[in-house]
Regions:
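Class I SAM-dependent methyltransferase SAM/SAH-binding core
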Residues: 49-51, 55-98
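A short acidic, Gly/Pro-enriched loop at the edge of an enzyme's catalytic core
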Residues: 99-108
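A short SAM/SAH-binding and catalytic strip from SAM-dependent methyltransferases
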Residues: 107-120
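A short glycine-rich, Lys/Arg-flanked "PGG" loop and its adjoining helix->strand segment in the class I
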Residues: 121-136
């Protein structure tokens, strides 16, 4: 049973699974996966918690890197797919806001899941609790100027030139976004909200990057360079 059916994920799960496949969508395949892999491989991480693991794709990537991984997600249909693809994996129904793993993980990952969490403060607190002292919190997130775009986002001006509209940037809000038979409730928050919550837990910022595309069509690459979708942050919990 889903922990929360009001965010669109339960009804969008089948379309999401079909779009992701094994390689992921454009953003994962051509923008995020390479730098995210670089942050987990060869660093001696023994165990990891993937918060908002969805269909388990990044859990499988971490396991192939030799990291024992637990994935949690509030959508049962996504977990069912994760277990189907990885029968020996550890996938659990749960939310970041209410999980309680104790300080037991070398690595906690949020791969494009913070925008789905209604109580960001509780979610980040849960992630920090799950880290052992000295552990790493690795976050891939949508940029806040991008999430400030909907409902207008990409439009065309009077001469047909594509423009991206940003508005109400400082106003935290939930917005329904729809694409390819999916309709999901996403949260916009200014970057300062994320940074303040993470800093208030005493975490130390070790990396902030805005990765560029490594492939895709010329149109996809050009659009991403004009209005980047993603950033990556790595934080360390003090010893």
């Amino acid at each position: 049973m889903n922990e929360d059916v009001g965010d669109g994920w339960a009804t969008s799960a089948a379309a999401w699974i079909a779009e992701q496949g094994e390689d992921g969508d454009y953003g994962r395949r051509f923008v995020l996966d390479t730098p995210m892999r670089a942050r987990i491989e060869g660093r001696g991480f023994r165990n990891a918690l993937d918060v908002g693991c969805g269909e388990g794709r990044f859990c499988r990537i971490m396991q192939r890197a030799g990291i024992r991984t637990t994935g949690i997600d509030p959508t049962e249909a996504l977990l069912a797919r994760a277990r189907e693809l990885d029968p020996d994996g550890d996938y659990r129904l749960g939310r970041a806001e209410t999980m309680d793993f104790g300080a037991s993980h070398d690595l906690v990952v949020s791969y494009l899941s913070l925008i789905d969490m209604p109580d960001l403060g509780a979610a980040i607190a849960g992630m920090v609790r799950a880290l052992r002292p000295g552990g790493t919190l690795l976050i891939a997130n949508m940029t806040s100027f991008n999430t400030a775009g909907p409902p207008e986002g990409w439009t065309r001006d009077h001469d047909g030139t594509p423009r991206f509209t940003i508005d109400h940037y400082m106003e935290e809000r939930a917005t329904w976004v729809s694409w390819r038979d999916m309709r999901i409730l996403n949260w916009h928050r200014p970057l300062s909200t994320y940074m303040t919550l993470l800093l208030d837990h005493g975490l130390q910022l070790r990396l902030f990057s805005e990765p560029q595309p490594t492939g895709g069509t010329p149109e996809q690459i050009a659009r991403h360079r004009r209005v980047p979708y993603f950033h990556i942050m790595e934080w360390q919990k003090p010893d």
